[in-house]
Structures are given as structure tokens and as C-alpha cells.
């Protein structure tokens, strides 16, 4: 029995945000072709055809960016329909997407719910921490719009988790972030260490996460997570859960 896991970037490096720490923006700026545009339907159809020929147990199809929703909802409707049509081996299909949340409305949320997408939505914590770095093209903070998108998904019963980039500000505000996530009922969380630009001095940005700060974050947040878990109030923290499952 064979399982296949796909990671598809339907909008290449395109994004409707200008996050200060964006690794992809730094990486794409150094490529000969920074952006390949929106994936064609012919290409996504061919990718799914080959993947589903190989899969007869499970096939996980995940979409990432840049910002994948820039490909448009019709693109995703087409992709899901193609996957179901080409699933001649009757593999179990799983769909996932990682998004900044700005495009999410009732139509998107209904689509995610209908097709059982797992949605990873980027939220860096409290408004103060989030809006320091996660800004749009007009350099305005996006906290309110992201929280609103999450509320829309909750109304539609969409499965989602929270993706948080760990920066210097995260370490300073980890208790406030933890309390905010707990208050909002965000029980499934992934924390991703921030990376400095490839060709710049490490630790030179106002958001830079040094090894020492990352160590401090891990110790502080693990103690808090463990204390609550032992009290019967465990939240899913991907990094810690993975370590304990090793």
C-alpha cells in the first residue's frame, strides 16, 4: 500500500502581505525567476494524475505559498474535483492549506468545510505582537482581519490550527500569547522559528530569533504547557507533542 504526500504552491511566491520576516520573500528575491505566476489548470491536473496513479492507500494534498488563496477559489474547486475524479485507486484523500487568512470569507469557509480541509492560519499572537511584523501591502496590521477569518471558519465548522512564527517579541510576550490563545479556544498550535535573511548577519533584525532566545522560549513555554497538561488542560503544541512521541 502506497501513500503520497504533495505540497503544491499554486501561486508561486505571490503574497498579499508584506511580513517583515518573510523567508520566502527573501528567498524568491534571489532566484533567477522570482515568481512563476498562478499554476495552470493543465499543470495541476497533470500533477494530480501522476500522484493518484501512485497512491492506493492515502494521498495528502497540501497547498502553500506565498499565499495559495491568490490562485482563486475556482482554482481550488477545480483541483479538488480533479483529485476526486482521478482517484481511481480509491485512496483516502486529505486536503490541507496554509494561509494568512486575508481572503477567507463565507464562500471559502464553506468550501473548506465541505471538502474537509485542514486549514493552518497564520496568527502571531496578540494584536501587539502580530501587527509588529504581519502587515499588508499598505503596511497596515492584519490582526483584526485574521481573527475575523478564524471566526468565519469556526461558524462553518472548519478544522484549523494556528501557525505562529517565533520572533524576539514572541519570547518577550509568550505568557500573553498563551493566555490569548487559550481565551480564544485555539487548542491546536504550531510554532515556527523565525529565520534571518540568508545573506545577512544573524541576529541583526529587530525581530531576529537568536539561538539563546529560542532556548529561552522553549524552556519557558514548555514549563507552562507541561504545568497545564498535568492539570488536565492540555493544548496541542506540535513541537512539544512531537518530542514526547519520539
Regions found by a protein language model. Give the residues of each.
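Conserved alpha-helical substructure of the radical SAM core
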Residues: 1-99, 103-110, 114-115
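Short, small-residue-rich loop/turn micro-motifs
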Residues: 12, 21-26, 123-127, 193-195
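Short catalytic/ligand-binding loop motif for oxyanion handling, primarily in non-cytosolic enzymes
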Residues: 28-31, 70-72, 128-129, 171-172, ...
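Short acidic, glycine/proline-rich loop/turn micro-motifs
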Residues: 31-34, 131-135, 200-205
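Amphipathic alpha-helical segments in well-structured domains
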Residues: 40-44, 76, 143-146, 214, ...
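Conserved AdoMet/S-adenosylmethionine-binding subsite of the radical SAM
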Residues: 70-189
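Radical SAM enzyme [4Fe-4S]-AdoMet core and its adjacent flexible, acidic
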Residues: 137-144, 151, 155-246
Amino acid at each position: 500500500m502506497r501513500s503520497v504526500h504533495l505540497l503544491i504552491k499554486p501561486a508561486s511566491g505571490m503574497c498579499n502581505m508584506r511580513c517583515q520576516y518573510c523567508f520566502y520573500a527573501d528567498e524568491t528575491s534571489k532566484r533567477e525567476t522570482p515568481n512563476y505566476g498562478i499554476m495552470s489548470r493543465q499543470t495541476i491536473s497533470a500533477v494530480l494524475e501522476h500522484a493518484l496513479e501512485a497512491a492506493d492507500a492515502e494521498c495528502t494534498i497540501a497547498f502553500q505559498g506565498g499565499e495559495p488563496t491568490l490562485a482563486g477559489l475556482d482554482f481550488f474547486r477545480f483541483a479538488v474535483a480533479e483529485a476526486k475524479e482521478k482517484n481511481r485507486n480509491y485512496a483516502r484523500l486529505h486536503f490541507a492549506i496554509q494561509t494568512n487568512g486575508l481572503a477567507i470569507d463565507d464562500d471559502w469557509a464553506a468550501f473548506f468545510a465541505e471538502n474537509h480541509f485542514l486549514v493552518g492560519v497564520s496568527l502571531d499572537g496578540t494584536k501587539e505582537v502580530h501587527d509588529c511584523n504581519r502587515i499588508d501591502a499598505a503596511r497596515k496590521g492584519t490582526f483584526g482581519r485574521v481573527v475575523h477569518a478564524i471566526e468565519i471558519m469556526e461558524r462553518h465548522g472548519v478544522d484549523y490550527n494556528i501557525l505562529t512564527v517565533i520572533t524576539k517579541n514572541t519570547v518577550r510576550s509568550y505568557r500573553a500569547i498563551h493566555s490569548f490563545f487559550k481565551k480564544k479556544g485555539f487548542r491546536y498550535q504550531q510554532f515556527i522559528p523565525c529565520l534571518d535573511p540568508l545573506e545577512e548577519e544573524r541576529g541583526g533584525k529587530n525581530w531576529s530569533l537568536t539561538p539563546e532566545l529560542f532556548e529561552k522560549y522553549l524552556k519557558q513555554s514548555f514549563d507552562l504547557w507541561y504545568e497545564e497538561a498535568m492539570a488536565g488542560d492540555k493544548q496541542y503544541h506540535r513541537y512539544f507533542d512531537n518530542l514526547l512521541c519520539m
